[in-house]
Amino acid sequence: MATLGPMNTKVTTTHLYNHRDLREQAMIMLKEVRAIDGVEALSEQFVRGLAEPGLGHTHYTVSVDGRIIGLGATDGETSELAVHPAHRRQGIGRELIDALPTDGVWAHGDLPPAQALASSLGLNKTRELLVMAVEGDALREAAVYDNPAGITNSSLKTAPGTRDEVEGKWLKANNEAFHWHPEQGGWDRNRLTRAQSATWFRETDVLFLWDGDELVGFHWVKKHSDELQEIYVVGLAEAYRGKGLGDPLVRLGLRHMVNGGARRVILYVEADNDSAVAAYEKLGFTVAERHVVYEK
């Protein structure tokens, strides 16, 4: 391990997936941050990176009395960090940002402490991701699904063709829909396989619309619990955009979630994706959280 920064707040560079005791400390701290802030400090991918060497993440820790009270993580392109609420306004966030190698740092929730730190460092907000949510009567109304004429639907488990063929069509539609997206675009078979290794993944929660044997689009659901579920990824193949099929594709997944017991559904969407935000607002979704990237 290498040590960076002044002696009063040492920032240690490490790989937590190689150190079980430190990883457990980090997870405890993240739970305490969640309890106080009301939002997760690290995204799902970065939490997985604490334990999975294959993701190739590097970690930066600050400890007091043998206990981690500050954590940074990077995948080489972007970074995330957390400071325990009891140790904020002590320069720890500044030290972590100085140690992180990327220009962009996520602030999940864009809470006042993060805004204050960004302002003090002269960081600029360059990206904003919205968490939108729907529940109650609005959710039940949004979950009304009418199958478009000439279109069929299936799950990944019941899709026509071999698994290899279906996943190839799924990847093609994904990369057409998200060619512009920094995390969701440019997927290959290995990336899809890693995504399916998540503990929450179920074949029955990946839904498809079909035009014969052509994939129209997909709706991937993430089940946090019976009551709380998520539109994880939804996308249309290029050939089927602009044909009014986006709305039924979203409703197909919402019906699936409501039938599975969902009482609240969330999704993540780029704040500057005006058409998508408007479509979700039309279905009854409202903004619940904001996540931003600040850049040096």
Swiss-Prot record:
Residues that hold 1D-myo-inositol 2-(L-cysteinylamino)-2-deoxy-alpha-D-glucopyranoside according to the record: 44, 183, 222, 230, 268
Binding locations of acetyl-CoA 2: 234-236, 241-247
One example of a Gene Ontology biological process annotation: mycothiol biosynthetic process
Keyword Translocase in record: no
PANTHER family in alphabetical order: L-AMINO ACID N-ACETYLTRANSFERASE, MYCOTHIOL ACETYLTRANSFERASE
HAMAP family: MshD (MF_01698)
Protein name: Mycothiol acetyltransferase
